[in-house]
Amino acid sequence: MAKQLLFDDTARKALERGVDALANAVKVTLGPKGRNVVIDKKWGAPTITNDGVTIAREVELDDPYENLGAQLAKEVATKTNDVAGDGTTTATVLAQALVHEGLRNVAAGAAPSGLKRGIDAAVDAVSDQLLSMARDVDGKGDIAHVATISAQDPAVGELLADAFDKVGKDGVITVEESSTTALELDFTEGMQFDKGYISPYFVTDAERQEAVLEDAYVLVHQGKISTVQDLLPLLEKVLKAAKPLLIIAEDVDGEALSTLVVNKIRGTFNAVAVKAPGFGDRRKAILQDIATLTGAQVVAEEVGLKLDQIDLDALGTARRITVTKDDTTIVDGAGSSEDIAGRVAQIKAEVERTDSDWDREKLQERLAKLSGGVVVIKVGAHTEVELKEKKHRIEDAVSATRAAIEEGIVAGGGSALVHAVSVLEDNLGRTGDEATGVALVRKAASEPLRWIAENAGLEGYVVVEKVRSLEVGSGLNAATGEYVDLLAAGVLDPVKVTRSALRNAASIASMVLTTDTLVVDKKEEDLAVNGGGHGHGHGHGH
């Protein structure tokens, strides 16, 4: 494929136009008075959103050079979203400001490498300052405020405060679409997996069609159980202990299953068999999770444990197990808290390592099931367009709240950045182009606040100067137009979101400033014209 090249200042200007196109589309959504953006879809209703990363993902420009700039700006939004789950618009606005001012200085003769060193040093200093300004999330009130600011809806804030109260910071909160118009919260205590009883004869509560085992043993088996000889020695021991038994295995069939069913019907003892969830390596991992939670050992040939040789100490126990035809819930497993904490740490390390979104989601689910439960928030709305927009806002709010619990909170409304750059007053002792790089960050940091104010119909630069003169923690509440103590008023931002936005913006801006050449594919029509197609037919009609 033939390539086109663009060099020097012309190349950087093209990148800047691309960054501008994307940033201008995104920054109108900033703040409580921000506008929405409507995105056309190839099929179905258009999407209405005020989420920076959703808008950014849709932007593709016609000019290939400008498109490179837009894609770089898109990277700012997606990276911030991956790390913090929110703050994508802030990150894009910061990147635009750094690129603008930076390129002006490069055109005036500043060395891009010097600017980059200054920017990096400034970002590190501001990032540390933000951390020192942060305070820990304190109870449901703070969580409700953070979620309210992110979703721009107090009802969502209250609901998420309840959700996190129930499942803790590692718990899974999933957002699903509902057929009603209401917002609802479903909480599942303990570990639940999507496999039910193998035979309906195991049911203990005929009315609810579920099997309930109180204070039960749990057998976790990696293979199939078909022959009753393998199972009999264990069943006799369980019978003596007079406790019910849950069997989780790849499958239970043949005479092993019929023996369990017959004994259940006769009332000799109460047992329920369910298939293991998942498949392949994921099934092995989930079985180990269940074993850790209940204090069991996974019975498998590969670890030298045979079913006909095990004692009761290889079984786990749980206070209550409920099995329906579709799923199994284990509440209060007897696994030791150290083992569970170790398993949780191991899964967290896997989450950090994985590149696949699907794997990450599945690992997060396993994490939640080990650490306390699952909340499902059901979102309803009057139209499909409104439903999608609402669901998106709530997902963002969940991410923002999680980020807040992790690293703490600072005053919102763009004021934390304006106050944090006070550490750059002396340009960090740098000189020359590095000092200019530090100054770039100091100037760019006020842009999110300026656009929050502009979108609220106020004079941006005036607001920035006013907030700068206020003490740390105070700023503009754009929803009311008043200058208040933002921490007291509940206008809060997760510090992780603000730091990620600044870091990712600086990273992309530095790339643009140090770029000198752009290489893109030549367009098809250019190739056709230059190739001079001489394939004309000369058929003469008689």
UniProtKB/Swiss-Prot annotation:
What reaction(s) does this enzyme catalyze?
ATP + H2O + a folded polypeptide = ADP + phosphate + an unfolded polypeptide
A single Gene Ontology MF term assigned here is: isomerase activity
* Residue sites binding ATP per the record: T29, L30, G31, P32, D86, G87, T88, T89, T90, G413, N477, A478, A479, D493
Q: Which SUPFAM superfamilies match?
A: GroEL apical domain-like, GroEL equatorial domain-like, GroEL-intermediate domain like
- Please give the PROSITE patterns that the UniProt record associates with this protein: CHAPERONINS_CPN60
One GO cellular component from the entry? cytoplasm
Offer one Pfam family short name for this entry.
Cpn60_TCP1
Q: Where in the cell is it found?
A: Cytoplasm
- Top enzyme class of this protein? isomerase
Q: How does it assemble?
A: Forms a cylinder of 14 subunits composed of two heptameric rings stacked back-to-back. Interacts with the co-chaperonin GroES.
Q: What does this protein do?
A: Together with its co-chaperonin GroES, plays an essential role in assisting protein folding. The GroEL-GroES system forms a nano-cage that allows encapsulation of the non-native substrate proteins and provides a physical environment optimized to promote and accelerate protein folding.
This protein is called what? Chaperonin GroEL 1
What gene is this protein a product of?
A: groEL1
